[in-house]
């Protein structure tokens, strides 16, 4: 098997200036002239104080960020970022998992996508990985409970090892861990580097003496420049050559960190021989290649749907809350509007009932907002690494919520419909259930879209509340279309409430189209004042609009799903840039 050596040639990175700012200000460099080399079976530790540029350098080495100048080479060949990501793995500082899945289930999901043609080997691969990471005894433990910080970090490392990368990059793998857990993590990384003959590069703030014994080479950074790059056991000699003697009570690295600001000349490693440019014959095609996924779309959707169902089933509290909420609210409304009749008072009450129904159904979906926001970093990590297609995630999410929200719609509709005494027709009832179902699906898509945009739960909740209030205000229930200022008229047509309210009104009064709802009685003369058709005419509605409103609601459902996909696609592309 071919072994790889990773190197960089004069990498610099400057913080991009805003194109909107017309200024002659020079760019601020975070990294300057970084030239390094990392060999297989060795750990290279990037060490430096906060703000030295460690994380930025790792992002560049992982091909997540493009350097301002310089190049990354693998066996002296300029890398193609897309191809390079297939043989490398990046482990971020913060662990992100689904807390309701077990360690084994988390590994099995990724392994099934990475080994679609060898599904029989998945269990053996997972078992072997659990053993290698000393996690066998925690295989059936849920990630949200019972795992220490060090064990969670090992799970993150395990996920990155499933496709057996040649280069493993880790951002602060010991951050937030106690000394023993930190040592255990680095010890496992050392074992991986030697047993698999892989390149391991990690950033670390200030390693302990025990951890230093596991590190082969160090790259000491200060203010974005290299102070020293080489073997750890040669650091003391380097310091001596600069006129610094290491005190007996300190090791060479501790002393180097203390006098970092006094080592004025950045270290230049004369032993690293890198070409200024790669010969054309050795250059890889720099054009971004199409990402080829290891699993088919059907396999991806199937596995993602299975994971979604498992998480929903295990979120029993939310599941039962949604079902009970729909049942209780439906029954309470049914008893409040019990047999409301069809007269003048009944017409007014129906408007109120339908308006409240829409408010309840659309606002209740905000319960899923924190779940979607918590899932987002996991989704970005998995899709940016090429584990599965983003579109497969959106489709699987849709397929799972279709039957789940249909159940909610049926429970709410049946508990309400007959108590209120709405139009008794199986066709009308079926249409009512259909509209309620599409409303909750549309609301789910709306929340999904906002969760892709919102930076956090508080901002997401505020956005949902403000926009739903605006949609309700411009629905025509409070202010008619004719009374709206022309410059606000567009909001009337963008209001989700409008089409949903119109659909419910048309369904009810089409059924009562020829029935007299309000009579004029004087002496022996009885004449009909208002029919169901008159109610529709007064509100500018017609029976032929019945399916138009359904199509509009479906359009909103699809639109918000597509917008969510585009926002997430932009985020995924940003994490690969």
From Swiss-Prot:
A GO term, aspect molecular function: ATP hydrolysis activity
Family per similarity comment: Belongs to the ABC transporter superfamily. ABCG family. Eye pigment precursor importer (TC 3.A.1.204) subfamily.
Gene coding for it: ABCG4
Binding site for ATP: 48-55
GO cellular component: membrane
Domain ABC transporter: 6-248
PANTHER family: ABC TRANSPORTER G FAMILY MEMBER 28 (PTHR48041), ABC TRANSPORTER G FAMILY MEMBER 4 (PTHR48041:SF9)
Domain ABC transmembrane type-2: 299-509
Name of the molecule in the record: ABC transporter G family member 4
Pfam families given in the database record: ABC2_membrane (PF01061), ABC2_membrane_7 (PF19055), ABC_tran (PF00005)
Compartments, record wording: Membrane
Keywords on record: ATP-binding, Membrane, Nucleotide-binding, Transmembrane, Transmembrane helix, Transport
